[in-house]
Amino acid sequence: MRAAISRRFPTAPGFPRDAGAYLKGVEDAYVADAYHSLSIEGYRVSLELIERVRSGNWNPEVHEHDREQTNAMAARGYWQSFQVVKKSIGRVMGGENPGTVAEVGHREWYREMFAPSVAAGILKPADLAGYRGGQVYIRQSMHVPPSRDAVRDAMPAFFDLLTQETDPAVRVVLGHFVFAYIHPYMDGNGRMARFLMNLMMAASGYPWVVSPLAERGAYMAALEKASVGEDIGPFADLLASLVGKRLAGEPLPAVPKKSI
């Protein structure tokens, strides 16, 4: 898989010299990233909702609508998780190994992603501790993720490999793919995998990449081919194309101004 990935990817720009400028670029990508990442997972979000929860105008203890609105909780959780992912990127900018940063940080990303469900009384804090405690299945996929017991062995091994990996493209592609393949949580695995992918992007100076909703079919088909057909090529091609567009200065995928 490694050779198939490396020859497809653009050359890495190298470690960013200006960490502040890089992090500003990440922040500027937030709205597009939140809209497309959440929409890929089936949530119905809008520019207005994303901006509202980001501004802090979200309170399930006061507003019943926010407590009952699944989309609002997902959007708020995405914003909270995005903040700690940025902190992880800051640690990588400070010279820490991206694999180590991901291993330590991904649990906090996950807790923040579902913290609004805890605030609304839907989940208990204990529900967010550790990896999944049961089997998970992926809709419209022939891939069956490992058992809960296998996950406990697979995740440390995964992070060990990620920590030792030196090829920027391999870190990006396999970081996303293997996390999604293991599916360590009952929910949120796609969002987590894309966060992990972008942390690996930052480690080599690639810009933050947004997976467009319009390419959801190709994205899911490429993951399926890698998971079931053991062919990482289409997935590597898809990510390489997105990276290439960003390096060429193309704008991020658009966000509709009206609610969907």
Roles of regions detected by a PLM:
Residues 1-260:
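FIC/Doc superfamily catalytic core
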